[in-house]
From Swiss-Prot:
Belongs to the influenza viruses PB2 family. Coiled coil: none annotated. The gene is PB2. GO terms for molecular function: RNA binding; RNA-directed RNA polymerase activity. Signal peptide: none annotated. It is found in: Virion; Host nucleus. The record marks 627 as: Avian adaptation. Its main location: virion. HAMAP family: INV_PB2. The keyword Transit peptide does not apply. One of its GO terms (cellular component) is host cell nucleus. This is Polymerase basic protein 2.
Length: 759
């Protein structure tokens, strides 16, 4: 107090004020403080002080030739005095204004190319639609999300090499561009940025944004793809949300989405093959997504999803250490347990062998629509705090947690036998048996669980066995919370092992993932997925199997031909013929095979009866184990389009049609390729063009341009007309149907209409 009074007295004297404002600061400590180091200690003050001067900027001497000494108003733009301590000129801020108005202009052609992601963002926002604002409690959970739309998926190191190669090609230093995407991007960017005048450092910085995925751990309620995250601040607050539909999609979101679909399809297909792991690897290596190899995408893309992680594990890549059960990602946050086999009896007195986790553990459970915190002891649920979007989602989480707890009352709630099987018809393990059982119907489970009175805790309410909320009672140990549970934030990845049945384990032997955990949800991929493996032919149904099988034979005809004559058994056992067997009626498979093999043997024995088209046509039928019988067939049946369709042993049919004039084969109206040699066969019928999804309007109409091949038809828009070349070089006018529902009748009417159109 005394000191302050003393200071006040001093300040009241004018001399004190003069000393403080007029005299120079010459105390060494103060001078040191403000002058040591390169770091500016008071940037705001420095800026104000500098800008108050007449010439606060220094510039290269050349500026004197480029800028007049005075502007139109006669104000000085630069000073003749040199900058102290450097060979530069002192320049006024007015010079900047003059330069901006009158300085040289440069080409703007590179701006949209360099700042591509920014321009695209503006377009997305321009075409996006913002809906109404709703006020309600937002259950946000922190998730790791992608924050810059429109990026490639290079690692920081890969991107660095690309940037150096594009922006500073003459710099020294070894740059190894190995991955396909690196090479493509480098080539593309070098072309785009030829003669680019934008500062190289700026280009490098922007390129980095475009090449590397940037993720943040942000609270989100709703869409997590990058085009939603870029407007997060506009679409959700603490107590409000604004509806928004993005005005465009970006490739990185499409890649993530398509990768998940491809991985799910591949895992599902691998599960049912003889050696799941080998099949899975074969499919991953032969699949492309949006024209890029799936294995390259898997190496670069950080998406965490059960099927994607199984594929990564198979390739020997590290994955997240959390494990999956019932579609929820579990992460242990504290405690530990040992595992012990134990036999338990269900309510139906069926014996189950389960691996019991002994010990106290806490987990976070994160699903798409619900999250929870679970505390459990040995075969006992202590507490479950769950939050979710709706009653249904909350119920799903509760069922998974109850099954995971392995409590006796859950096992005793089983009614009836447990005999769920996977796609390969193998019994599921006991924990998944229980899960499937209660996911079908959890009434008994909830009724038998028990209820308890609850205390009034802020933000928490109880939930009754019928899944209605309550403030008085709740399922034992279970509470519903308004707050979500954050996703596990760490991006740490661990080394895992995978067995031939695609079960993924960490180094302690805990199962993290298995095919049972792969979602059955079907979706339509945004990017084209090309499965080259014959195992995936059936994904698009029987017709695709049929077309692909014949395409494969034609593509590999040279090799097939030699094997056919020298080592037929090996040819018959090729895996490419496996999918085809599902099209042949079970009852006749063996007979067909015996018949075709005998026919082929006769061809080999009798010179001059080698008939290429017939061999190609009948070869897939010879792959089944043959039955010895004297049966002769004039046609073989295949099950496509919901019914049996015939392939004629001699001659053409809608299923298999060889056009002698063009030497092309069409299978179900789809082009299956060209034969290089000329097989001698009778003329093919006009029935070839069973055009699904097209209406035949009549004879050729020159107004609609030159005749298209059957292949080119797929590019037509609905309702568009075109001339098309069918069968024996005849041309008819067709229109692509506006509705898909009428496709079925096309097959029956097409043949009649073609005849009429030609005659």
């Amino acid at each position: 107090m005394e000191r302050i009074k003393e200071l006040r007295d001093l300040m009241s004297q004018s001399r004190t004020r003069e000393i403080l404002t007029k005299t120079t600061v010459d105390h060494m400590a103060i001078i040191k403080k403000y002058t040591s180091g390169r770091q500016e200690k008071n940037p705001a003050l420095r800026m104000k002080w500098m800008m108050a001067m007449k010439y606060p900027i220094t510039a290269d001497k050349r500026i004197m030739e480029m800028i007049p000494e005075r502007n139109e108003q006669g104000q000085a733009l630069w000073s003749k005095t040199n900058d102290a301590g450097s060979d530069r000129v002192m320049v006024s801020p007015l010079a900047v204004t003059w330069w901006n108005r009158n300085g040289p202009t440069t080409s703007t052609v590179h701006y949209p190319k360099v700042y591509k992601t920014y321009f695209e963002k503006v377009e997305r926002l321009k075409h996006g639609t913002f809906g109404p604002v709703h006020f309600r409690n937002q259950v946000k959970i922190r998730r790791r999300v992608d924050i810059n739309p429109g990026h490639a998926d290079l690692s920081a190191k890969e991107a660095q090499d690309v940037i150096m190669e594009v922006v500073f090609p003459n710099e020294v230093g070894a740059r190894i561009l190995t991955s396909e995407s690196q090479l493509t991007i480098t080539k593309e960017k070098k072309e785009e940025l030829q003669d680019c005048k934008i500062a190289p450092l700026m280009v490098a910085y922007i390129l980095e944004r475009e090449l590397v995925r940037k993720t943040r751990f942000l609270p989100v309620a709703g869409g997590t793809s990058s085009v939603y995250i870029e407007v997060l601040h506009l679409t959700q607050g603490t107590c409000w949300e604004q509806m928004y539909t993005p005005g465009g999609e970006v490739r990185n979101d499409d890649v993530d989405q398509s990768l998940i679909i491809a991985a799910r399809n591949i895992v599902r297909r691998a599960t049912v093959s003889a050696d799941p792991l080998a099949s899975l690897l074969e499919m991953c290596h032969s699949t492309q997504i949006g024209g890029i190899r799936m294995v390259d995408i898997l190496r670069q893309n950080p998406t965490e999803e059960q099927a994607v992680d199984i594929c990564k594990a198979a390739m020997g890549l590290r994955i997240s250490s959390s494990f999956s059960f019932g579609g929820f990602t579990f992460k242990r946050t504290s405690g530990s347990s040992v595992k012990r086999e134990e036999e338990v009896l269900t309510g139906n007195l069926q014996t189950l062998k389960i691996r019991v986790h002994e010990g106290y553990e806490e987990f976070t459970m994160v699903g798409r629509r619900a999250t929870a915190i679970l505390r459990k002891a040995t075969r006992r649920l202590i507490q479950l705090i769950v939050s979710g979007r709706d009653e249904q989602s909350i119920a799903e989480a509760i069922i998974v947690a109850m099954v995971f707890s392995q409590e006796d009352c859950m096992i005793k709630a089983v009614r009836g036998d447990l005999n769920f099987v996977n796609r390969a018809n193998q019994r599921l393990n006991p924990m998944h048996q229980l899960l499937r059982h209660f996911q079908k119907d959890a009434k008994v489970l909830f009724q038998n669980w028990g209820i308890e009175p609850i205390d009034n805790v802020m933000g928490m309410i109880g939930i009754l066995p019928d899944m209605t909320p309550s403030t008085e009672m709740s399922l034992r140990g279970v509470r519903v919370s308004k707050m979500g549970v954050d996703e596990y934030s760490s991006t740490e990845r661990v080394v895992v092992s995978i067995d031939r049945f695609l079960r993924v384990r960490d180094q302690r032997g805990n199962v993290l993932l298995s095919p049972e955990e792969v979602s059955e949800t079907q979706g339509t991929e945004k990017l084209t997925i090309t499965y080259s493996s014959s195992m995936m032919w059936e994904i698009n149904g029987p017709e695709s199997v049929l077309v692909n099988t014949y395409q494969w034979i034609i593509r590999n005809w040279e090799a097939v031909k030699i094997q056919w004559s020298q080592d037929p058994t090996m040819l018959y056992n090729k895996m490419e013929f496996e999918p085809f067997q599902s099209l042949v009626p079970k009852a006749t498979r063996g007979q067909y095979s015996g018949f075709v093999r005998t026919l082929f043997q006769q061809m080999r024995d009798v010179l001059g009866t080698f008939d290429t088209v017939q061999i190609i046509k009948l070869l897939p039928f010879a792959a089944a184990p043959p039955e010895q019988s004297r049966m002769q067939f004039s046609s073989l049946t295949v099950n496509v389009r919901g019914s049996g369709m015939r392939i004629l042993v001699r001659g053409n049919s809608p299923v298999f049609n060889y056009n002698k004039a063009t030497k092309r084969l069409t299978v179900l109206g789809k082009d299956a390729g060209a034969l290089t040699e000329d097989p001698d066969e009778g003329t093919a019928g006009v029935e070839s063009a069973v055009l699904r999804g097209f209406l035949i309007l009549g004879k050729e109409d020159k107004r609609y341009g030159p005749a298209l091949s059957i292949n080119e038809l797929s590019n037509l828009a609905k309702g568009e007309k075109a001339n098309v070349l069918i069968g024996q070089g005849d041309v008819v006018l067709v229109m692509k149907r506006k509705r898909d529902s009428s496709i079925l009748t096309d097959s029956q009417t097409a043949t009649k209409r073609i005849r009429m159109a030609i005659n």
